């Protein structure tokens, strides 16, 4: 399809999609969630580098499940007391400026805690047996992200009984390190680091909860199935964050969301006529799913990851056609069933 067939400019339409109609949002005010937030970075960077061994002992006592993950998984150190002591001393010295910036921006995390607590109320509403993790903030390497089971990279990570929030990736889009050439080339290009803002923390955290409940194992499947499986993830995320802006959940800008909504029919026609929906070729799939500034073959106004957005619309249509289905039933429904029964034919 020629690029000129897409509508490029809708100057007022973004206003229509900032707060979508969520239908009936359940009342979760009576659901008790005792969310605990622990500040690992404060204890870690308070260690006296002259007596690191004593400080590490206190860390292991206070954070018994998190500390081994921090040193082994986050810092990538072997299980050697001597190496951990030396590298901890070195890390504290080299990264103190990053910690100080995080401390300045996140001295009080009360608002973030309140938002997460509200999100977890919705989690408990839909999945009462889900165990709420302790939130642990940290400052880790500025050049390392956590690799998730589905192959994506996340700023945060989920452990057995904790959810780690890496504050070094939420220091504001204008933070100087994010604009250094090494960081842009090797860690996060600016179309991603523009989201390294405080308001994205709850959505990033809830994405981990969604993936914990229903891991995305669609890799290797045809494009249309991956689109729908990933669309399910955003559909459930929307259930956990019904009052939050779609821009925070998708990572799209408001203008990109407006473009998607204005061109939904053309985008779907593009997929159908391109004959790519059944492809399993990774290089083709990568063009439509995953992080990128825009979608190749579509106007610059389009966002990257357009495939997940289309999958989300299909799942929403399927859920609307089947209002009696519970979230678990929708999340476990076969992609082909969802596609067929959604009767998805946007104009």
Regions found by a protein language model. Give the residues of each.
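C-terminal motif of bacterial Sec signal peptides marking the signal peptidase cleavage site
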Residues: 15-18
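N-terminal mature-domain "stem" immediately C-terminal to a signal peptide or N-terminal signal-anchor/transmembrane
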Residues: 20-89, 93-94
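C-terminal soluble interaction/assembly domains
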Residues: 272, 278-347
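Acidic/His-rich structured neighborhood in mature extracellular/periplasmic domains
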Residues: 87-257, 332-335
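Acidic/His/Gly-enriched intrinsically disordered linker/tail segments
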Residues: 227-294
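Positively charged n-region of N-terminal signal peptides that target proteins for export
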Residues: 1-6
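Sec-exported extracytoplasmic/periplasmic mature domains
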Residues: 45, 75, 121-128, 237-245, ...
């Amino acid at each position: 399809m020629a690029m000129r067939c897409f509508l490029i400019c809708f100057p007022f339409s973004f206003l229509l999609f900032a707060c979508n109609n969520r239908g009936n949002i359940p009342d979760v005010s009576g659901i008790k969630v005792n969310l605990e937030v622990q500040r690992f970075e404060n204890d870690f960077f308070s260690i006296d580098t002259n007596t690191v061994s004593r400080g590490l002992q206190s860390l292991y006592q206070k954070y018994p499940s998190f500390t081994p993950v921090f040193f082994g998984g986050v810092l990538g150190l072997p299980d050697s007391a001597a190496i951990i002591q030396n590298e901890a001393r070195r890390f504290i010295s080299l990264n103190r400026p990053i910690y100080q910036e995080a401390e300045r921006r996140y001295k009080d995390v009360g608002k973030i805690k309140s938002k997460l607590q509200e999100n977890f109320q919705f989690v408990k509403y839909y999945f009462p047996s889900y165990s709420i993790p302790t939130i642990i903030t940290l400052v880790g390497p500025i050049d390392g992200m956590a690799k998730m089971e589905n192959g994506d990279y996340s700023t945060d990570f989920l452990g057995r009984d904790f959810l780690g929030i890496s504050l070094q990736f939420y220091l504001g889009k204008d933070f100087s390190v994010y604009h250094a050439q090494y960081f842009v080339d090797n860690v996060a290009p600016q179309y991603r680091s523009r989201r390294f803002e405080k308001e994205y923390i709850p959505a990033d955290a809830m994405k981990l909860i969604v993936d914990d409940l229903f891991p995305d194992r669609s890799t290797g499947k045809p494009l249309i199935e991956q689109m729908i499986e990933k669309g399910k993830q955003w559909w459930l995320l929307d259930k956990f964050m019904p009052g939050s802006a779609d821009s925070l959940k998708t990572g799209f800008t408001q203008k990109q969301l407006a473009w998607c909504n204005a061109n939904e029919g053309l985008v779907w026609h593009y997929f159908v006529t391109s004959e790519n929906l059944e492809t399993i070729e990774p290089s083709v799939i990568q063009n439509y799913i995953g992080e990128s500034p825009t979608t190749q073959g579509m106007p610059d106004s389009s966002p990257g990851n357009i495939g997940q957005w289309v999958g989300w619309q299909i799942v929403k249509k399927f859920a609307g056609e089947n209002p009696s289905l519970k979230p678990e039933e929708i999340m476990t429904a076969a992609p082909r069933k969802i596609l067929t029964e959604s009767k998805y034919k946007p104009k």
